Amino acid sequence: MESNKDEAERCISIALKAIQSNQPDRALRFLEKAQRLYPTPRVHALIESLNQKPQPAGDQPQPTEATHTTHRKAAGANTASANGEAGGESTKGYTAEQVAAVKRVKQCKDYYEILGVSRGASDEDLKKAYRKLALKFHPDKNHAPGATEAFKAIGTAYAVLSNPEKRKQYDQFGDDKGQAARHGHGHGDFHRGFEADISPEDLFNMFFGGGFPSSNVHVYSNGRMRYTYHQRQDRRENQGDGGLGVFVQLMPILILILVSALSQLMVSSPPYSLSLRPSVGHVHKRVTDHLNVVYYVADTFSQEYTGSSLKMVERNVEDDYIANLRNNCWKEKQQKEGLLYRARYFGDADMYNKAQKDGAPQAVTDCQRL
């Protein structure tokens, strides 16, 4: 089973670390568990290597070297069999199953197919599918070519489908946008036509409490993930043959900038803040009549807003306050749920107890305020 294979890989990883730390008994225990879960010649060779050359805890040079040699051979064989053309792309090993899984995601036509769920899937179904795939495709665990892009596609798929409004829009227009994006960018872009507001790496950290370092993923200030090779490719494609060509290509961007600037001038900033903001003059504290929400205004607020206009402002204040509570409550619940899942996945009782305590008081408080 796929779950047994993932657990076996985790046991192998722990065993290799134990060998490096001169803990042969611990290494042997986890290797035997891995062999029971998902028997492979590689694990059998590691077990034989430890059994043939037992050493005291403080003197383990020969088993360690033999085991590392066996591991390197197994990793090299997996890499060569997985993809001969991509062998030089990464110095880390990967399996044929990982390459096939990346290929499956790459060939998916919509977000539902990426997550492996039906169009009528519930929120719980989406969470289960995302947890399984995110751990499987995270760039620090899966080193197959294209795994990083597949991880991004999985995160974007969940972020869109878990948002009721975005999911409704995607069900109506997502396929058309996905086709336009694929025609414009090729298969390597993994459905860039319909973006989410949260980056896949941030989403992973919310679910699993930052279980992996983001060494291969670049997240910029707008919260969406981009990759350097896409930028270099776009720059090469957008280079014009002359000044007129450059001007024609830049014309849509200039128009967009002009429209954005005009819209900023036409839209005034809110006359209130939910927190103290001296930089914009919101220093005077007020409380709404209905929900007693605290907000801050400028010196001239009392003269400019009275009667119905004041009621409208306070209604907007309360709407913003409730939206913030819902967002914070959802994030804290997701983070706690992710920590609990990781604790159960790794069988760590201390982590489970910590997850039961961390974040719970604030999450309950925010939800109760609603």
UniProtKB/Swiss-Prot annotation:
Q: Region annotation Disordered: residue ranges?
A: 51-92
Q: Which GO terms describe its biological process?
A: cellular response to misfolded protein; chaperone cofactor-dependent protein refolding; ERAD pathway; protein-containing complex assembly
Where is the protein localized?
Answer: Endoplasmic reticulum membrane; Nucleus membrane
Residues found modified as Pros-methylhistidine: H185
Name a GO molecular-function annotation: Hsp70 protein binding
The known PTMs are summarized as: Methylated at His-185 by METTL9.
Kindly list the positions at which N-acetylmethionine occurs in this protein: M1
For the J domain, which residue ranges apply? 110-174
Q: Name one Pfam family in it.
A: DUF1977
Q: Which domain of life is it from?
A: Eukaryota
Membrane topology annotation:
Single-pass membrane protein
For this protein, the parts annotated as crossing the membrane are 242-262
For this protein, the record's PANTHER family field holds:
AT29763P-RELATED (PTHR43908), DNAJ HOMOLOG SUBFAMILY B MEMBER 12 (PTHR43908:SF8)
Name of protein: DnaJ homolog subfamily B member 12
Organism, scientific name? Bos taurus (Bovine)
